[in-house]
């Protein structure tokens, strides 16, 4: 079990899905969020769900990161700032998007095997690009994140470009498959069922 807290981001708009993807049934669980939470709870001592609407997840006995400080902004920047504010004693956070259900323990172990040291972040990268919502973020990014919010800039790629980042190269693109559209959801359901 890892002592670094894990933040499961489940507060996105889900505009491409047409409904809240965090609440879609997944595998044998009531929701994708429950599936992710229970999996991550076997790897990390503390798992938090980041959302503006914790009442939507009352089917999960979980702790939440309250993202209500900016009710009209649906962006991970808000989740990061809220998490750093709520978890004052933590020097770093492991983050994962709710819509990446195939990130496994072996992959998480690869992040944990690296010393954060002077890095601002340790982020997953595949051949298709970087995956900002899969990795470790240092508290050193808290002030830059606040500044981004003040400037109404929510592009994590830009933050990472201006930071000291170690990228973990992941060969298998499928591990970072996102569930953003109805087609991707159906594909993920088949994959998790072993079809």
Role assignments for model-derived ranges:
Residues 1-141, 146-153, 158-175, 183, ...:
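Nucleotide and nucleotide-moiety/phosphate-recognizing core
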Residues 180:
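Active-site rim beta-loop-alpha module in soluble metabolic enzymes
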């Amino acid at each position: 079990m890892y002592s670094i807290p894990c933040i499961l981001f489940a507060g996105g708009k889900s505009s491409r899905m047409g409904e809240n993807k965090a609440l879609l049934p997944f595998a044998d669980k009531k929701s994708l969020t429950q599936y992710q939470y229970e999996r991550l709870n076997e790897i990390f001592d503390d798992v938090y769900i980041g959302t503006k609407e914790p009442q939507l997840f009352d089917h999960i006995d979980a702790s939440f990161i309250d993202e209500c400080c900016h009710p009209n902004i649906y962006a991970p920047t808000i989740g990061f700032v809220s998490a750093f504010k709520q978890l004052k004693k933590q020097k770093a956070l492991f983050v994962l998007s709710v819509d990446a259900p195939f990130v496994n323990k072996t992959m998480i172990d690869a992040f944990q095997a690296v010393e954060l040291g002077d890095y601002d972040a340790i982020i997953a990268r595949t051949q298709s690009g970087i995956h900002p919502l899969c990795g470790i973020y240092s508290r050193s990014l808290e002030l830059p994140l606040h500044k981004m919010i003040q400037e109404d800039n929510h592009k994590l790629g830009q933050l990472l470009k201006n930071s000291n980042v170690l990228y973990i190269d992941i060969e298998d693109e499928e591990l970072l498959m996102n569930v953003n559209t109805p087609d991707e959801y159906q594909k993920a359901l088949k994959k998790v069922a072993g079809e």
